[in-house]
């Protein structure tokens, strides 16, 4: 479902639209100590619903990780809050012919360890994302690329397999973060994940697992020093302690705020809540390789048994809409004429009967705060499944375990995900998740793959719309 996650950002303190981008509350000024004692470091403290599981930007797409990795690392392009694509580490780009893109890179940029940024780093970073040996979490994002050349230190030439008008936009989000070739090859992936080095406005200075990560401002940032000295990200998985920390002034921002708790924040004179429609969906991932979820009739029954309107009304206080498919409202080729996903428990029972379902366990794995309301939604959905005769089990797992299961594709049944529409196009969410090698690649369908591949390469928007309509 599409929801209003009650978003908050400090774009004057953190760069870009991806700085925070999730639920939270924001004090009306910096912490009192920072205002009163200007000789001390100006510190921003954020509490989120779980630890940062991965600092390596090519090995995570989860909210708890990427809102910080997009500030440690830069992309060649950057999508700003105005929705437009702006220069990042690339100052300009142009299409030559139908499938060759040339990017001019920003000069004088340094990584946090002092190494200069060059086209060699850009080439290495992008190729790493789709290298089968690397097994990254963003393997589907840049697979339209055929080859990359770096003719000089500040020019990058990318040849796509077929025309790809979305390439500059792809490079501005998941998978497009630039990592330092020399440093990563020297220290290896494990050390790089623990001690990441980027070109972004903050750099990691310490990390205590399941407690906090500390970032200091990059004084040499090419975009100018940000308006703070230090960023502290605390892990507070439970909602009540997270809210209490905010109200006591121990933190400045909290994320993953349940809608039914908003009044506690708005009722306090020093805190406030802001919201915006989330550019994505809350979806249930499915391990279709595991019985009984390998039976399409069982999956259809599970979908038909979910009363999404009730979830939006009761758990989200009306802050959301029921989607009509895997394309987010507002994206290219969103079809408003399609009805919302159906709720029909009687038909759900019929399909379970046709499937020969005999009470096998169906697991729904959830955290307590990876996405706001994930555990209450899981419990509500499981109850709806039980009502139609499904032996549904909810298992609560730690966020770090969830992240590992996502990387290794070892979910035992179903799980929550909150994919973001990264391109304003089905290719940026649906294909990224469900395409070959994507995070939800527990299934394959020849027609889906055929049409998805054809649509992502086509410049014929009429054909693209028809293709996406068929496969959704």
Can you say where each PLM-predicted feature lies in the sequence?
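Structural transition elements
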Residues: 321-354, 371-376
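Gly/Pro-rich hinge or "lid" segments in bacterial periplasmic/extracellular proteins
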Residues: 80-84, 172-226, 230, 240, ...
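Surface-exposed binding/hinge segments that line
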Residues: 94, 139-183
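Extracytoplasmic/peripheral linker and loop segments enriched in polar/acidic and small residues
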Residues: 102, 297, 387, 391-402, ...
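Ligand-site clamp/hinge motif
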Residues: 190, 218-264, 391
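Aromatic- and charge-enriched surface segment that lines or borders ligand/interaction sites
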Residues: 91-135, 157-159, 245, 292-294
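N-terminal lobe/hinge region of extracytoplasmic solute-binding protein
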Residues: 47-98, 127, 195-199
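Periplasmic binding protein-like
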Residues: 46, 114, 253, 383-437
């Amino acid at each position: 479902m599409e929801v209003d996650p009650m978003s908050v950002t400090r774009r004057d303190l953190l760069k870009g639209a991806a700085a925070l981008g999730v639920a939270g509350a924001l004090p009306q000024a910096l912490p009192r100590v920072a205002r009163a004692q200007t000789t001390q470091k100006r510190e921003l403290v954020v509490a989120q619903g779980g630890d940062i599981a991965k600092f390596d930007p090519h090995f995570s797409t989860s909210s708890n990780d990427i809102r910080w990795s997009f500030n440690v690392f830069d992309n060649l392009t950057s999508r700003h809050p105005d929705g437009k694509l702006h220069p990042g580490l690339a100052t300009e780009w142009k299409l030559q012919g139908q499938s060759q893109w040339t990017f001019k890179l920003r000069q004088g940029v340094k990584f946090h360890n002092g190494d200069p940024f060059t086209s060699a780093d850009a080439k290495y970073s992008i190729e790493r994302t789709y290298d089968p040996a690397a097994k990254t979490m963003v393997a589907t994002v840049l697979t339209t690329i055929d080859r990359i050349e770096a003719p000089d230190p500040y020019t990058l030439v990318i040849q796509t397999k077929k025309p790809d008008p979305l390439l500059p936009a792809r490079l501005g989000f998941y998978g497009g973060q630039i990592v330092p070739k020399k440093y990563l090859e020297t220290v290896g992936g494990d050390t790089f994940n623990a001690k990441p080095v980027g070109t972004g406005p903050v750099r990691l200075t310490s990390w205590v697992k399941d407690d906090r990560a500390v970032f200091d401002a990059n004084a040499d940032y090419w975009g100018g020093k940000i308006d703070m000295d230090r960023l502290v990200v605390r892990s507070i998985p439970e909602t009540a302690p997270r809210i209490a920390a905010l109200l006591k002034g121990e933190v400045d921002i909290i994320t993953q705020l349940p809608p039914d708790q908003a009044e506690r924040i708005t009722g306090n004179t020093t805190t406030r809540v802001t919201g915006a429609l989330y550019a994505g969906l809350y979806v249930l991932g499915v391990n279709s390789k595991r019985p009984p979820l390998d039976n399409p009739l069982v999956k259809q029954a599970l979908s038909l048994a979910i009363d999404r309107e009730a979830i939006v009304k009761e758990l989200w206080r009306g802050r959301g809409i029921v989607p009509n498919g895997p394309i987010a409202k507002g994206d290219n080729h969103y079809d408003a004429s399609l009805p919302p996903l159906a709720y029909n428990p009687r038909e759900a029972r019929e399909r379970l009967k046709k499937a020969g379902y005999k009470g096998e366990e169906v697991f729904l794995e959830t955290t307590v705060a990876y996405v706001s309301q994930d555990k209450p939604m899981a419990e509500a959905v499981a109850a709806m499944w039980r009502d139609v005769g499904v032996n549904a089990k909810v298992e609560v797992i730690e966020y770090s375990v969830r992240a590992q299961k996502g990387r290794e594709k070892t979910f035992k049944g179903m799980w929550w995900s909150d994919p973001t529409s990264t391109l304003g196009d089905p290719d940026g969410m649906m294909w990224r998740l469900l395409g070959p090698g994507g995070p939800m690649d527990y299934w394959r369908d020849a027609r889906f793959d055929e049409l998805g591949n054809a649509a992502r390469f086509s410049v014929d928007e009429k054909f693209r719309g028809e293709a996406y309509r068929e496969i959704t």
